[in-house]
Design a protein with these regions (language model features):
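Short acidic-hydrophobic, aromatic-tinged amphipathic segments that line or gate anion-handling sites
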Residues: 117-123
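A short alpha->loop->secondary-structure connector
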Residues: 88-90, 110-117, 165-172, 211-219
Length: 352
């Protein structure tokens, strides 16, 4: 790609403009309670979760989070990325893997070091939630910023009765989820522990013509006790073509998934964010941010402020990475997202 200015000048030019726009931003994200927030690896999803409480958004500590959706929609990717970000902050990670399929090489792609986590393969619902109640920090670990527990996925958990083939209808599992969550959720809040679980969806045969066509296994307790529920939906498969020895070949290199804030007591619900997940890379935040700016600003080229990055998404990504503009791009997205959200803030006189 032909560049008309040197990378250093381009970077400094955009950064100066970004500083001015930040100073002019009269309504940055407000927050209350905890100031400990974990990123999902996606700027847009972080903002959708709590952009009105924290400037950069993210998942606050001390809550239960459920990530659910159909198979292949990116649930495990999101789970591993959050766990990897916890490790980067120096936090402790306990990873329950009832499906027994965590790929260690795959997890390293997200910064998650398998050797440094407490890894278990539980069989029952009780095993998972009792570990939360019994996980008391050691005296020499008081400087650990956050303790986190992950479970992938809740749908794979059983009960002692079911294992002994005494639960023919499968009703005991829903009861155990309700009992265990009732005992565990207060401890999660008191100890400021973050618990993130993935779950599958099943067809709801009793939905009728107007009811919800799907449901999550394990009864209603998980959704009831979760402070944040994220639903992942596969939007499309990302394809690329390459020419090898004069022949054109096409491969699927990743997926685009939509994450809906299905329930939230963290901030406003019913926001959504698009995630681009590449098989050999993980969550492509640069791609998502560039497409967001191009869509909301309705420009013909990819750009950051006054800086044009070209019409090709691959060229634009390369320019951002070459000039080290990742943080500048992120700040631009946050500023514009806040400007849009501010227009939907109720300006009426407070009732109380």
């Amino acid at each position: 790609m032909q560049r008309t200015k040197s990378p250093v000048k381009l970077s400094s030019q955009v950064k100066k403009k970004q500083r001015r726009s930040e100073l002019q931003n009269s309504s940055p994200g407000q927050y209350d309670g905890t100031d400990l927030v974990i990123s999902t690896g996606s700027t847009l999803l972080d903002l959708a979760i709590s952009g009105g409480r924290f400037r950069e958004g993210g998942i606050p500590a001390g809550i239960l989070v459920e990530i659910f959706g159909p198979s292949g929609s990116g649930k495990t990717v999101l789970l591993c990325q959050i766990a990897g970000n916890v490790q980067k902050l120096g936090g402790r990670v306990m990873f329950h893997d009832p499906e027994a399929r965590l790929n260690r090489q795959f997890s390293r792609m997200f910064g998650l070091v398998p050797e440094d986590i407490e890894y278990t393969i539980p069989d029952t619902v009780t095993e998972v939630f009792s570990s939360v109640r019994n996980w008391i920090p050691d005296k020499d670990e008081q400087d650990v910023p956050i303790y986190t527990i992950f479970a992938d996925s809740l749908a794979a958990l059983s009960t002692e009765m079911e294992i002994g083939e005494g639960d023919k209808m499968g009703m005991r599992r829903a009861k155990e989820f309700s009992e265990e969550l009732r005992k565990t959720c207060r401890i999660i809040t008191q100890r400021n522990v973050l618990m993130v679980c993935s779950n599958q969806i099943r067809q709801n045969l009793n939905a009728g013509p107007y009811g919800q066509k799907w449901k999550t296994p394990g009864g209603e307790a998980i959704g009831f006790y979760s402070s944040l529920r994220l639903r992942c939906s596969l939007v499309q498969k990302l394809k690329e073509s390459r020419v090898v020895r004069g022949q054109k070949h096409e491969r699927i290199i990743g997926i685009k998934t939509k994450v809906d804030i299905f329930k939230s007591s963290v901030w406003k619900p019913y926001r959504e964010a698009d995630l681009y997940i590449l098989f050999d890379y993980g969550i492509d935040d640069i791609r998502a941010n560039l497409r967001f700016l191009k869509t909301v600003l309705k420009t013909s080229v990819y750009r950051i402020g006054d800086l044009s990055l070209g019409k090709s998404i691959d060229e634009a990504i390369q320019a951002v990475e070459t000039d080290h503009l990742e943080q500048v791009l992120k700040d631009e997205v946050i500023t514009i997202w806040n400007e849009i959200e501010e227009k939907f803030t109720d300006q009426r006189k407070p009732r109380i």
